[in-house]
Amino acid sequence: MASNDLETKHLETLDRDLGRFSSLEKATSYVAKPLVAPALALIFIIIVGILAATTLSGVSNTIIIVIAAVLGAYMALNIGANDVANNMGPAVGANALTMAGAILIAAIFESAGALIAGGDVVSTIAKGIIAPTSMQSVDEFIWAMMAALLSAALWINLATWVGAPVSTTHSIVGGVMGAGIAAAGFSAVNWMTMSKIAASWVISPVLGGDIAALVLW
């Protein structure tokens, strides 16, 4: 009888210890899980910076190029977290695509679109919104564009954190315009180009809604 009581106590103690271990494991998982994504993002940014530094070692303005690469990597992460989610959200929500399929399609076609047809958009962002000649020096223009890239990335990061879908285009165009005004005044901005861009922001959702309505007619 005493042996049975002792065995029962041992089992109860073992159950309590296993329960504590299970609770500790759950708590560790709960704390660590939110840190995985930021850690992977940081690793990606560091790798991009290292690759840029090693590839361009010995080139003039290497530091500026490395900083630009790091900011570009940070911006790319934010585009994936917010802008790509905007595009793929309806398809995933309608169960037309799985999350893995949506990510794969986004990775392929976002990259292909930028490489095949992104030149004109890059030119507009780089030279069409603010005139490089309005700056006192090339370095001033470079740092203005850096500031625009960083400000847009920070804003998209904040919007992603609060779960707000925002436009990368709006963010970077606003960043470039603001940086140009801060560096060289309102005269630095090409207001005709800005008017066309702003008009497209109004036309795009209306046109998209009309086309969607026609498809479902």
Identify the role of each PLM range.
Residues 2-217:
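Alpha-helical transmembrane segments and immediately membrane-proximal extracytoplasmic
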